[in-house]
Amino acid sequence: MANRANRHAARTEDSDNTINYVQCDGLAVMKMVKHCHEESSNMDLAQGALLGLVVDKCLEITNCFPFPKSGDETMDEEMYQLTVMRRLRRVNVDHLHVGWYQSSDVGNSLSMALLESQYHYQTSIEESVVVVYDTQKSSRGFLCLKAYRLTPQAIQMYKDGDFTPEAFRTLKVGYENLFAEIPIVIKNSPLTNIMMSELNELLPEDKGHNFLDLGTATVLENQMRSLIERVDELYQEAVRYNKYQQVVFKQDTEKHRALAKLAAENAVRTSKGEPTVPEEEVIKQFRPMTAPNRLTATITSGQINTHAQHIAQFCSQSLAKLFITESLQIAKEAKETK
């Protein structure tokens, strides 16, 4: 996935103000939704290319097509994309590559693969975005479609290839500012809006039988299970980093002790008129420790934060339904006692 956007010369992005909002055509949304739900039935990650154009500060997505699912390593995915876009151009369809999309499970899309892929896209196609579609949340009746772009700090960090704690502090990068969410709007043609209005009149009225359905059977369970897994991963990263700090502290202590001993020996040599030993002879015995990669821990922290927000939102809605149910039950019992 990381080499799918390498057909353009890489260039550095200096500003995150290239795109102010994303406007997505209704047909493109339907094609993305259809593809993501088809792949979710097989527990696979759906991915595809976004086509459109940039008008002022607006990125218009007018079409899309899925990436091929093939186990053949000899298949040239880049050539496949170029062939599809060339054929779309022949039928007068927008063929400019403006990003990519992928499905999301349990409402969490932040991952190392997403970061790497978007970096290659954004450094080769400046205006590119990644659109994430949450299949699970959308299946409950809430269309969840979000567009993201890497922040300049994240691009600079990934370009330098330095994921040490010092690099994160210098660039002020955290899980909350790895990606910047871009507002996305869905636009339909006037004829489509007229047809939807007519279809809305033909639909039966919702009697609200499922209004108070808590629906906690699978949603909360999946969110909690994923949250526990991410917390375990973050704990392992914390243990690994603590061991690194302990080794560094032990090495520094031994180095200071050796330097102090050398200083005392050099003082004796000086008093005897003998040449002193330079400190470099001691320092080079202690090789600097390689700092652990903190990008994985940062991404895991972002996943934990996302799961916690989803759980809090879901629980607040469920509590509201519980209070409403309690009030209705009390009113019903009071009416029956009369």
From Swiss-Prot:
Name this protein carries in UniProt: Eukaryotic translation initiation factor 3 subunit H
One of the record's GO cellular component terms: eukaryotic translation initiation factor 3 complex
Pfam families membership: eIF3h_C, JAB
Domain MPN: 22-154
GO molecular function ontology, one term from the record: metal-dependent deubiquitinase activity
InterPro entries per the UniProt record, alphabetical: eIF3h (IPR027524), eIF3h_C (IPR045810), JAMM/MPN+_dom (IPR000555), JAMM_MPN+_peptidase_M67A (IPR050242), MPN (IPR037518)
CDD domains given in the database record: MPN_eIF3h
Organism: Drosophila melanogaster (Fruit fly)
Entry similarity comment: Belongs to the eIF-3 subunit H family.
Gene: eIF3h
Biological processes, Gene Ontology terms: formation of cytoplasmic translation initiation complex; negative regulation of proteasomal ubiquitin-dependent protein catabolic process; positive regulation of Notch signaling pathway; translational initiation
Record's subcellular location: Cytoplasm
Keywords: Cytoplasm, Initiation factor, Protein biosynthesis
Role description: Component of the eukaryotic translation initiation factor 3 (eIF-3) complex, which is involved in protein synthesis of a specialized repertoire of mRNAs and, together with other initiation factors, stimulates binding of mRNA and methionyl-tRNAi to the 40S ribosome. The eIF-3 complex specifically targets and initiates translation of a subset of mRNAs involved in cell proliferation.
Domain of life: Eukaryota
Quaternary data: Component of the eukaryotic translation initiation factor 3 (eIF-3) complex. The eIF-3 complex interacts with pix. Interacts with mxt.
PROSITE patterns with a match to the protein in the record: MPN (PS50249)
